[in-house]
Curated annotation (Swiss-Prot):
Its main location: plastid. SUPFAM superfamilies: Cytochrome f subunit of the cytochrome b6f complex, transmembrane anchor (SSF103431), Cytochrome f, large domain (SSF49441), Rudiment single hybrid motif (SSF51246). This is Cytochrome f. InterPro entries: Cyt-f_TM, Cyt_f, Cyt_f_lg_dom, Cyt_f_lg_dom_sf, Rudment_hybrid_motif. The chain crosses the membrane at residues 286-306. It comes from the Eukaryota.
Length: 320
């Protein structure tokens, strides 16, 4: 009987430990993941809205620059580089989810024309593989191979991200034509200010939800604050919760107004978007151009030779 109770107790403890670990994993994963471009796919069918705005800007509120470099023209069924540059001051530190300071991560979303896609590994040259490093790109959706996402990755190592892109071949894909196409890119550095569910992260400013007198500021054991605001007109109390990692701008006894900042702005990152154009060139046009240029060069050569021959004839007639 005692042995059976012992086994039952062990089984209950193991089950409880697994449940707690699973809950911690889910909570931690959700709080971290929702701050980067790669996880916009959980909430948006298409990362680019009809207005042209990339949805990552809904969570990363600060505007920062981003740049993209692609060739002016590419031939069908060839691999080329799309280099996304996400510049920022490498000395900056951001507030992490645990309230501590840490290095910034970066992420990007690349929206290619229909038919363009990530190049398969066997088509990527050793030189290009060296530029790519250990990055692992993903499709935004299984059926959207022309939209690629990456991140979060260490910003100090990958402030320039090289995407290996395979150009389509109109000969095998009738939906693709030899035209000029737009390419759109979005890139962020640092954590977002708002999660997809609308809640704030600890990487943004917290404002007072009511006006009045700050009667109490309680520092919580695991970090963060509880600020009690008393409305002087009716005595109603409002408690604002400040997460860990933020610096307070107010003190007890201070009179504040509605929406007045209670904390400084910890955000040192931001999101930016840009675009570029690329021409899918017909090889026959290139061959025709080369033939035309060759014809012009040959014509010039024959003209020079003819001129010299004419000058020799004139010279011989004058001597005669």
């Amino acid at each position: 009987m005692q042995t059976r109770n012992t086994f039952s107790w062990i089984r209950e403890e193991i089950t409880r430990s697994i449940s707690v670990s699973l809950m911690i994993y889910i909570i931690t994963w959700a709080s971290i993941s929702s701050a980067y471009p790669i996880f916009a796919q959980q909430n948006y069918e298409n990362p680019r809205e009809a207005t042209g705005r990339i949805v990552c800007a809904n969570c990363h509120l600060a505007n920062k620059p981003v740049d993209i470099e692609v060739p002016q023209t590419v031939l069908p069924d060839t691999v080329f580089e799309a280099v996304v540059k996400i510049p920022y001051d490498m000395q900056l530190k951001q507030v992490l989810a645990n309230g501590k300071k840490g290095a910034l991560n970066v992420g990007a979303v690349l929206i290619l024309p229909e038919g363009f896609e990530l190049a398969p590994p066997d088509r990527i040259s050793p030189e290009m593989k060296e530029k790519i490093g250990n990055l692992s790109f993903q499709n935004y959706r299984p059926n959207k191979k022309n939209i690629l996402v990456i991140g979060p990755v260490p910003g100090q190592k990958y402030s320039e991200i090289t995407f290996p892109i395979l150009a389509p071949d109109p000969a095998s894909n009738k939906d693709v034509h030899f035209l000029k196409y737009p390419i759109y890119v979005g890139g962020n550095r640092g954590r977002g200010q708002i999660y997809p569910d609308g809640s704030k992260s600890n990487n943004t400013v917290y404002n007072a939800t009511a006006g009045g007198i700050i009667s109490k500021i309680l520092r919580k054991e695991k970090g963060g604050y509880e600020i009690t605001i008393v409305d002087a007109s009716n005595g109603r109390q409002v408690i604002d919760i400040i997460p860990r990692g933020l610096e307070l701008l107010v003190s007890e006894g201070e009179s504040i107004k509605l929406d007045q900042p209670l904390t400084s702005n910890p955000n040192v990152g931001g999101f930016g978007q840009g675009d570029a154009e690329i021409v899918l060139q017909d090889p026959l046009r290139v061959q025709g151009l080369l033939f035309f240029l060759g014809s012009v060069v040959l014509a010039q050569i024959f003209l020079v030779l003819k001129k010299k021959q004419f000058e020799k004839v004139q010279l011989s007639e004058m001597n005669f």
